[in-house]
Amino acid sequence: MQLSSSFPISPPKIFPSTKHHKPPVITHQLAAQIQSNRRHFVSPVKVSGYFSSISRAIEEEEEYRKARAAVNRKGVELESYAIEGISVGGHETCVIVPELKCVFDIGRCPSRAIQQKFLFITHAHLDHIGGLPMYVASRGLYNLEPPKIFVPPSIKEDVEKLLEIHRTMGQVELNVELIPLAVGETYELRNDIVVRPFATHHVIPSQGYVIYSVRKKLQKQYAHLKGKQIEKIKKSGVEITDTILSPEIAFTGDTTSEYMLDPRNADALRAKVLITEATFLDESFSTEHAQALGHTHISQIIENAKWIRSKTVLLTHFSSRYHVEEIREAVLKLQSKVSAKVIPLTEGFRSRYS
């Protein structure tokens, strides 16, 4: 006899059976009930084959949930800075610090980069600069002020040509302030923030950037004076304070590990947050291979870890061949060698469970 769909008794969701069945989908409520039952149920047969399958399903579901949560994270909070973005070797790199209105490289121009006023380009490979015209055009579309884009001086002319081509093809203005900034030069972003490039080593011209906070400190010889006395000296035109630059965030872009051995890059290695690449993570690629491609193997960071004085290291630019779990395993090896907290930027990477 065929039952109508309006039959008042719903069929049970799980039918006990001695036959092998694919483990059912376990809801959180059912999982909790099963775990509770198992704590209070005593039997000579501790776990039947069926309940063993349920237990495995619970464990696998929890692993999957954790892995997906790790993959879906959009950003991290590091040393009071919210840092977000994506950096997949050879595909795209764009790291954003909203608090400072800064973007390091533009990748394919993710939408959340458009609101940031300052863009720092490390080098001219497409996975780092490809979205530049879109970034400029999008700011114009939203009636935002023209961005300030900082580039290595060697590529300024070519970037201008690139923008001019898009102006011609799209018949648009593309308003921008393009600033060539050489290694060692300093540019004031705000009255309390400056930027200074540092030398990196890639297969084409490249440079990293350090963002510094700026504060004024009263010179020692005036420390004993009272407020009115200090004000009087200031009005006379005498400089009574020293300018203190503190490295906050350093971004390397693509580079070999050689930058870590350059004493002129000490500020990058003592910034509160060091954002550095680690393209290769395992023994299937040698350090020589990484060096030839202008990249860094994580073993080279481990080897030179003694030079790192940063509070936090954010690793980026992993090869797309790696899963999130492999990245985290490699990070643990580095973490054991440095006092800094080591965090991987894993947006854009797949989990083994996805």
Swiss-Prot record:
It catalyses: Endonucleolytic cleavage of RNA, removing extra 3' nucleotides from tRNA precursor, generating 3' termini of tRNAs. A 3'-hydroxy group is left at the tRNA terminus and a 5'-phosphoryl group is left at the trailer molecule. It is found in: Plastid, Chloroplast. CDD domains: RNaseZ_MBL-fold (cd16272). Residues 1-68 form a transit peptide. Its main location: plastid. Residues 1-21 are annotated as: Disordered. Its cofactor is Zn(2+); Ca(2+); Mn(2+); Mg(2+). The keyword rRNA-binding does not apply. GO terms for biological process: tRNA 3'-end processing; tRNA processing. Its EC number is 3.1.26.11. Disruption phenotype: Embryonic lethality when homozygous. Coiled coil: none annotated. InterPro entries: Metallo-B-lactamas, RibonucZ/Hydroxyglut_hydro. Homodimer. Zinc phosphodiesterase, which displays tRNA 3'-processing endonuclease activity. Involved in tRNA maturation, by removing a 3'-trailer from precursor tRNA. This is tRNase Z TRZ2, chloroplastic. The lineage of its organism: Eukaryota, Viridiplantae, Streptophyta, Embryophyta, Tracheophyta. The gene is TRZ2.
